[in-house]
Amino acid sequence: VIGDILQRNCPAVIFLPHRDDWNKTHIGTHRLVMDALATTPGEFGCLVIETEYWQPMPDPNFMVECDPERLSILVNGLTFHKGEVARNPYHLDLPAWMQDNVRRGSELIGGQGGSACDIRFCTLYRVSRWQNGTLLRQDPAQAVLPADAWPCAALGTVSKKGG
């Protein structure tokens, strides 16, 4: 069913949790989408952007800044997820998680031992391209996306990593 939806709608970009995101629903979603991609015809292609939340990825290649105003909107929005925050108030830790992403991303994406990125909060992603039945890692043209930038600028032009 998901493969049919992909073929019918031909999305340019698909977001999904990365394979090892620990949470069983996230892992199941990853498997469902990857299985669906495998059913698409060879000419089908799109960007695949893997997200992380419960388990960090060892090799993200894209940082997206979240400015303090948007972060406050996210935290406020999460408070309406009553069942989740009643058992685990992770909305309170969201700013610290995004700060830690800046630390990790500065090293993993910017290069070990380099200067930290001049941002306070971010999310990390792994950008790949589904092409000819294969998932190929692709580094975005712009590895760090400022909060006020349009994502298509960074994702519209990608270069194939390693050749």
Map each language-model feature to its residues.
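Metal-dependent de-N-acetylase/amidase catalytic core
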Residues: 1-163
